[in-house]
Amino acid sequence: MKRSRCRDRPQPPPPDRREDGVQRAAELSQSLPPRRRAPPGRQRLEERTGPAGPEGKEQDVVTGVSPLLFRKLSNPDIFSSTGKVKLQRQLSQDDCKLWRGNLASSLSGKQLLPLSSSVHSSVGQVTWQSSGEASNLVRMRNQSLGQSAPSLTAGLKELSLPRRGSFCRTSNRKSLIVTSSTSPTLPRPHSPLHGHTGNSPLDSPRNFSPNAPAHFSFVPARRTDGRRWSLASLPSSGYGTNTPSSTVSSSCSSQEKLHQLPFQPTADELHFLTKHFSTESVPDEEGRQSPAMRPRSRSLSPGRSPVSFDSEIIMMNHVYKERFPKATAQMEERLAEFISSNTPDSVLPLADGALSFIHHQVIEMARDCLDKSRSGLITSQYFYELQDNLEKLLQDAHERSESSEVAFVMQLVKKLMIIIARPARLLECLEFDPEEFYHLLEAAEGHAKEGQGIKCDIPRYIVSQLGLTRDPLEEMAQLSSCDSPDTPETDDSIEGHGASLPSKKTPSEEDFETIKLISNGAYGAVFLVRHKSTRQRFAMKKINKQNLILRNQIQQAFVERDILTFAENPFVVSMFCSFDTKRHLCMVMEYVEGGDCATLLKNIGALPVDMVRLYFAETVLALEYLHNYGIVHRDLKPDNLLITSMGHIKLTDFGLSKIGLMSLTTNLYEGHIEKDAREFLDKQVCGTPEYIAPEVILRQGYGKPVDWWAMGIILYEFLVGCVPFFGDTPEELFGQVISDEIVWPEGDEALPPDAQDLTSKLLHQNPLERLGTGSAYEVKQHPFFTGLDWTGLLRQKAEFIPQLESEDDTSYFDTRSERYHHMDSEDEEEVSEDGCLEIRQFSSCSPRFNKVYSSMERLSLLEERRTPPPTKRSLSEEKEDHSDGLAGLKGRDRSWVIGSPEILRKRLSVSESSHTESDSSPPMTVRRRCSGLLDAPRFPEGPEEASSTLRRQPQEGIWVLTPPSGEGVSGPVTEHSGEQRPKLDEEAVGRSSGSSPAMETRGRGTSQLAEGATAKAISDLAVRRARHRLLSGDSTEKRTARPVNKVIKSASATALSLLIPSEHHTCSPLASPMSPHSQSSNPSSRDSSPSRDFLPALGSMRPPIIIHRAGKKYGFTLRAIRVYMGDSDVYTVHHMVWHVEDGGPASEAGLRQGDLITHVNGEPVHGLVHTEVVELILKSGNKVAISTTPLENTSIKVGPARKGSYKAKMARRSKRSRGKDGQESRKRSSLFRKITKQASLLHTSRSLSSLNRSLSSGESGPGSPTHSHSLSPRSPTQGYRVTPDAVHSVGGNSSQSSSPSSSVPSSPAGSGHTRPSSLHGLAPKLQRQYRSPRRKSAGSIPLSPLAHTPSPPPPTASPQRSPSPLSGHVAQAFPTKLHLSPPLGRQLSRPKSAEPPRSPLLKRVQSAEKLAAALAASEKKLATSRKHSLDLPHSELKKELPPREVSPLEVVGARSVLSGKGALPGKGVLQPAPSRALGTLRQDRAERRESLQKQEAIREVDSSEDDTEEGPENSQGAQELSLAPHPEVSQSVAPKGAGESGEEDPFPSRDPRSLGPMVPSLLTGITLGPPRMESPSGPHRRLGSPQAIEEAASSSSAGPNLGQSGATDPIPPEGCWKAQHLHTQALTALSPSTSGLTPTSSCSPPSSTSGKLSMWSWKSLIEGPDRASPSRKATMAGGLANLQDLENTTPAQPKNLSPREQGKTQPPSAPRLAHPSYEDPSQGWLWESECAQAVKEDPALSITQVPDASGDRRQDVPCRGCPLTQKSEPSLRRGQEPGGHQKHRDLALVPDELLKQT
């Protein structure tokens, strides 16, 4: 047809090449009357144009006018003859395709269309064939184009007169079009087209009538820009398109052959297709354009007008489909075929998980494209993004897999891209925005000219920039070579091939040794395993095949594997490999040590708002990452949020996840969001009932919004402690979810407004209105996160840092053995895989594992080559640039070292970077991990290395130990330390890493370093601060002289305020997954791994100072100081050099006055009481190695005495030995212990928390004073990591949580106990913080029912709670102030929890644990270990016990024990207060016990009330009891006391309360920290008065907690006494000044003032410790009875506990409370003198005089808190008992005064 029409055209393209639209148009034109034929001029033009050639054909398709256009224009009635001519012309031009010549009149739209190479090539040709005739258009073109276009004149010739006619025709048609336009698209006001309708697309129906002037917004611009841009001649003028305005359009493009598209003749059609019409000419009324206007070829792209996005998309798609029906249909058909043939369901799953995930995504993208195409929603932008995502997935495939299956994925992606290529090109042409392109081009041109100094001409530059000069074939060849599987993926791997070989080794179950069960789930169990060759720890999830097959969920297992393998995000658990065995599908993932958030909530209740913010923000980032990849988790809940060793979050468990479509920004329009919210229509209701979204329950289809609903539930649970919807059955629960309103806590528990608002928006019933549905950005912008640095979350210090006892410590996890039993599945028959071929594809190995494994292999090879195994591989060797400070890697450990140096490097660097960000512990973690790797001794392999570390030291200044302030390096490791530990034993390593801050204390033996080996303490903070002002001088010289080993540099190291890890710590492999033993893929876990933390210990500590005793003197006096955690009342006992005799051995050795003692003989001393430290020193013989750090380097600040020191609770290190606890008890309590410890680490003070984190992660030796020091910046908590608070929290397990009121700020106390204390500390802190919005009265906030999970009987390590470790510790660590009482019953529940629990979980949690059972357990615990000590509410004790005056003796006794054993009163040992006889105390205690037992029943009913009312009292009472002198403290007390105390823990817990008003009489001026509260199990002397008994009881309860917390206390009370007696002289020598500070007991009885110590308090005090003597037990019982009092005392116990909680046995908590009564040091690290000081003056009680450099002491106010000091009130609260204050005052004598008096 066309042929006949274009009779002049020599070579018409075959009709079959034309689009239907073109053919139809041709037919129409045929049918038109002859007059419509193109005028002769037009025909001539066509003749001139010549045959179209192949290009023409190709273009034919592209340029074919849209059928719609033709239909509209083809109606003869509608179109005038001019229209006829125009049509004809267009058809003829279509045939000709005018490729050879560019008509000036060609429409730009046409030009835009062809994007093919032919188009580009045509662009290159700018030759114009002259058309014989010139029309107005031609003239116009000439004029407007100016001379910028190379051959404009030639183009003029081509212009034929017919155009004029076409103009008229156009104008007519224009008006017609307006009326008849069927185009669905809205008019485009911006259409730039001038009236040049002849060629202009202006007429296109798609645009409203071009006549409207509004359409010509560009007109003025057009007129002014007569010139085409200078680049006009460039073929690169775009994609051969013109800009809408003349200025913008390039002469080239307009004159290029591109413009001669088949539909060129019909400007109207083009106009219809183009978005912008040339604004250059405004049609006159007749529709004619003035000749001045140059006909612009218009872009076919839809106008970028203000039309709404959706309508614009629809319009463009209509145009597109009308114009290219075949292209669209073909694409849809091919897409459907592609999807059906390649669906993951239709092919065997890929063996490689990452590739399998990518496979899913490619298919999902194809589905989405098909959907959009059918819905008319496709845009070129969509194609761009689709292509980008496909390329991104391809890149991911290459990066994450070395499998041969990459080829399959590549092929898949190529197929899809080919399918969408042509439609994408066509749409690109249609939508091309010339103006936008022009501006971009102009900018590029300017940039090229100015910035790049381009020499070549701009056109060529642009062509090259556009990639038009490249040879695709050549590039393809290069790509194929690059992508070949032979190419090693790891650029940084030195032996690429070597690495690839091991990577081919498929993992199997035989490669791993199972260590223990971590947890059970519905489908299988998770085990802690260790890779046999690499020695790395992993978590192996074993899923029973039979279960999967029976449930037809094999595919789901593959989905989980794919997601875990593909995901690479610091907040998502990563998988290393997977394989199948006879019975199981196994997935080996990184091991995240800290347990899950559900267990944390269970143990401590609602979290502090700051902690919630961090956890939630990290989860939001994890979710954002997953959603961006189309992953819908579907099972978000606290159980699946794991806590890394650094305290950060990792999301896990993708067993129910679905893989949907990757996020596309083009999908953000309303319609798609709605579709996205119903992405899955499987009607499946899956997930955990409490977290299932309403749309899932209603089976309305669901999508990503379900995860945001679950996030809302999680946020509520974090803040409140329980889920918002409860039900006895899923149906009931679902009913509430769908219809019930959320109940918000009110009053004190009210949530912060922003938190409540965020929660309510996340819990919106309508998924479309739910926050997060649009994107995670919505959530991140919420005011709740104001001020949050989303990019630095990993750098933030976490408040809760798990304290691991060993590398194999899984105590933070609940095994759930009672619910699931998968262990038996091993015996099941083998699963026949005949029907499950796909299962065989399950085995895969991620690049992570390959790299690690290959690294290990290389390491081992290197090892073999190297002769000295110890240095087998040094990081320096691996990479000189590894400034991490790993000078050498221990050869032996290398095998289990992180793996390849690159991995190590990455880990370290990651930890360094991410941890740098989180300055605190992460670096420690890194170090710890590395520590295993590095041999400390090896570090200084050579002088250069040493020098390198040293060179940093100079910055440090004096102490080598100090970490370079700027650098993350914890500090150089002393050479000798390295020597001492040439190799780190795995065991030691595990221990140290496990110990975390507590580790040091816990395993003193472990941390025992050779003299020189003492870990150097480095405090980045300190460094930053005053840089050893004390250290300057010779000591500096001496220290610097020591060669320093490189230490792994970790930013976190710097973060550690005071990192005093012992080298032993360093070896702890406990490290996190990163630990050599554990592999953690992500920086977060890596960083968090505790082992890493220990590493810093290697180099961080400065070399110990070796002091050789001269005669009987060491020549220095040490003093115990109270270091409060921030503003809390929890303090930890630290020891400082109070005085150094000039010319004495200490002075000669370089010991400096005012330095903080971190280690004695390699054993951390923070948290130890004074007597224990003295004993350590005396035990060392003629020489002692003392590690010190300048106080300035710590975060400890000296401040005035605290008025409320009597409330202070000492955070104790738990001394508990693993053996004692036994695996089971440890499991049970370890979680709590950890939590408490961490909680303590969390110390309220942020700085403390950060320190703690680093410490805990770094050294986290539970008892390690060092740790506390390192934490000091954060809080002494580490040192005190002590359990007081932790204990408190532990005590309540939930108690802490349950009694937020016990906001033991110093969870530090909790830190006393390694784990529990941290939990406790956390709980108090959490409560405090939690309160913050509603925290104000944290004490009063009842723990959430969850939090309340019945607290195991306080100290009883009630097996019920595996987390009970906290509770176990509770007794020891709870400061009375904490009001552990609430913890006891967990009765403190948030007011909400007080309500009858709605949730089964609440009920479960609240299920009362019989008080008696708890007591029994607690008593056992107490007896068995200090850790487990009963916390008796002091108030109860007070009630039980008749008010008694606290005999000064008692108070003093506690302290005196500390001060020195056997020391005469004159020597500073407090004598028992005459006021009470031990017998009386015992009687009181027995009575108490009975009363407690009686009260137990009552308590169950009244517990909540009691908790709220008595909690404080009880806690105080407990404190008093706690204050009971410890044997160690009151050594002066008859040795018998000591012996008795010996029954209990050797040292009473050092809770100041437990210590009672021990006179800070330091035997030698060295104030021993308050003795551990733990007292011998045997009854102790009781203070004469019943109060004393009460106090004793409480102290016993509290003391036990303290004792527990003071796990590190090495000396039993008896031992302490003995040691004290034996070394009294030595002590005296040590602390010549009698004014040593008694660390914990602030109060000493007045008698103590007199200096007379009686044994009385000892016994009770001793009993106070974990080990409860029978009498103590009785006392504890009494304490329980007094629990009510305690509750009263302890605001922490809200009255509004849920009945359940009330029912909970508070006594156990009370004992814990008692422990809590042991006052937690406030976070501010202030030393307070012991009770003796308290005796001095009441106010002094508030703060023990902190021995300033000046030497004065602060009195420990805690005396009041000391049970002994307080009269009837065991409670520490001074205010409670008027007399108590006075007594406390008496007791509060400064140690010096006390000593003098004594």
From Swiss-Prot:
Keywords carried by this UniProt record: ATP-binding, Cell membrane, Cytoplasm, Cytoskeleton, Kinase, Magnesium, Membrane, Metal-binding, Methylation, Nucleotide-binding, Phosphoprotein, Serine/threonine-protein kinase, Transferase, Ubl conjugation
Chain residues that bind ATP: I518, S519, N520, G521, A522, Y523, G524, A525, V526, K541
Reaction catalyzed: L-seryl-[protein] + ATP = O-phospho-L-seryl-[protein] + ADP + H(+); L-threonyl-[protein] + ATP = O-phospho-L-threonyl-[protein] + ADP + H(+)
Entry-linked InterPro entries: AGC-kinase_C, Kinase-like_dom_sf, MAST, MAST_pre-PK_dom, MAST_pre-PK_dom_sf, PDZ, PDZ_6, PDZ_sf
Residue ranges of every copy of the PDZ domain listed in the record: 1104-1192
GO cellular component: cytoplasm; microtubule cytoskeleton; plasma membrane
Family per similarity comment: Belongs to the protein kinase superfamily. AGC Ser/Thr protein kinase family.
SUPFAM superfamilies: MAST3 pre-PK domain-like (SSF140482), PDZ domain-like (SSF50156), Protein kinase-like (PK-like) (SSF56112)
GO biological process: cytoskeleton organization; intracellular signal transduction; protein phosphorylation; regulation of interleukin-12 production; spermatid differentiation
Biased composition (Low complexity): 245-254, 1072-1088, 1240-1273, 1287-1312, 1408-1417, 1588-1598, 1627-1654
Native species: Homo sapiens (Human)
Span of domain Protein kinase: 512-785
Ranges of biased composition (kind: Acidic residues): 1503-1512
Keyword Kinase in record: yes
Basic and acidic residues: bias regions: 7-22, 43-60, 874-892, 976-989, 1418-1443, 1482-1502
Active site: residue positions: D635 (proton acceptor)
Enzyme Commission identifier(s): 2.7.11.1
Domain of life: Eukaryota
Cross-referenced Gene3D superfamilies: 2.30.42.10, MAST3 pre-PK domain-like (1.20.1480.20), Phosphorylase Kinase, domain 1 (3.30.200.20), Transferase(Phosphotransferase) domain 1 (1.10.510.10)
Membrane topology: Peripheral membrane protein
UniProt name for this protein: Microtubule-associated serine/threonine-protein kinase 2
